[in-house]
Amino acid sequence: MRRYLVAASLLLLLTACGTADTPATPAASGGVTPIKLQLQWFFQAQFAGYIAAVDQGFYKEQGLDVQLLEGGVDIVPQTVLAQGKADYAVAWVPKALASREQGAGITDVGQIFARSGTYQVAWKDSGITTPADFKGKKVGNWGFGNEFELFAGMTKAGLDAGKDVTLVQQQFDMQALLKKEIDVAQAMSYNEYAQLLEATNPATGKLYTPGDFQIIDWKTNGSAMLQDAVWANTEKLNDPAYQQQTVKFLAATVKGWAYCRDNPEACRDLVVAKGSKLGKSHQLWQMNEINKLVWPATTAGVGMIDEAAWKQTVDISLTAKNQTGDTVLTKQPTGLAYTNDYIKQALDQVKAAGTDVTGTAFQPQTVTLTAGGA
């Protein structure tokens, strides 16, 4: 089996691209250690826990001065980390594993999202209810490593992505589905799906409702893969100072996510104030949906890597084929792909201070979206 093209290109990215003009700051200043965290997208509630940890002083309590580096379409967080231009990075597990196979020295030290938030969405009257129904249809996807679950679902349904469907490069919005240029579109539960519900149905003059759409949720058919995780520099993890710093960073991060679980409106406001391009109702929806992906956490606590979920992600990465027959990975990950050592120490620390790290009592909100997400 061959690699995905996106994975093959990552070796070049490791030596040719980056987003930060200055390296990760190596030394403490005045007793405070400066840290750069590379996010994988623009500021939005997907990263509210980190934003809150900065705003609420949780990182400062640990002696860390954390700078959040905004992501974007052309930014590969794990590459920025591997190049030494950030101290930590947030990235989806399969994307990062593909980078590791190409030589990136990175390790998952905190699995913040316990669940996948990826959907494929069709019109309710389309007759599309399962991945098998994609046959003969125009199937939208974003690419850039976001499509692995889609290919996993189609592979599991017995479809050949190169022959049985027409793959369409989708923009990071839902206009192609709304205009019926494609039959099924990729969406995140916390972002693009909300954009559909913020759009006006021209036939009624009212906003679309969930009843207008059919969701294919990869969590329900065994094709889900682990997503947002905190990645560290593997080589630096040999340094006791970086090990200690990682525990501190994770402890403050856990507190940030617990704060957003308990204060979703406040975290929504922090995200909007940070310069989010999307409005208040959209960001509250997103905060609520993100909380569903984080909470309840594993019984051991938020950030602990569940071995069964990790195995499923790796197995899919080895077997799901794209339109050219390539897979995400060609072999099992080697070396220190993940470790629970540092997150466990961080959890012990914040639990001792009274923070709820499992969120077993978490209940999602009911969020009312407005036109355009304003």
Segments from the language model and where they lie:
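Pocket-lining segment of extracytoplasmic ligand-binding domains
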Residues: 94, 172-175, 182-277
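Bacterial N-terminal signal peptides that target proteins for export
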Residues: 1-6
